[in-house]
Amino acid sequence: LENMSAYCASKAAVNIFGEILAKEVKDTNIRVMVVCPAQTDTPLMRFVDETDAPDAINTAVKKGMLCDPEEVVDQIEKDLLTDKIICYPSKEAVYATRIRRFFPNYWWKLVAKNS
């Protein structure tokens, strides 16, 4: 899990910024929702070999573990019709978030195993 600290720190910062911003503007006509998808099958995956963890992503691609982008968009659209601040557009995103939050040691073992 090399060279991921900047990515992880910036992702965490953007997530909490979005959550707080949503609370700050709740009484206005502005709507903020943080979207937390799992790895999604997008053109970005074509650049997988240029990342620091190509093996983990290639494994996910080969095993069909990437989320369908249309399903992700469908869930985002549904959640926009609610008061949700955070959108987890796939069951994989929900599972990953819960495992990381409640079982951090197990989460990091999974990450290391798949890296």
Residue ranges and their predicted role:
Residues 7, 15:
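Catalytic tyrosine of NAD(P)H-dependent dehydrogenase/reductases that use a Tyr as the general acid/base
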Residues 13, 20-21, 25:
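Conserved alpha-helical elements of the SDR catalytic core
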Residues 1-5:
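Active-site loop immediately N-terminal to the catalytic Tyr-X3-Lys motif
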Residues 23, 27-91:
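SDR active-site lid
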Residues 10:
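Active-site helix of classical SDR
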Residues 84-115:
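A transmembrane-helix-recognition feature enriched in membrane-embedded lipid enzymes
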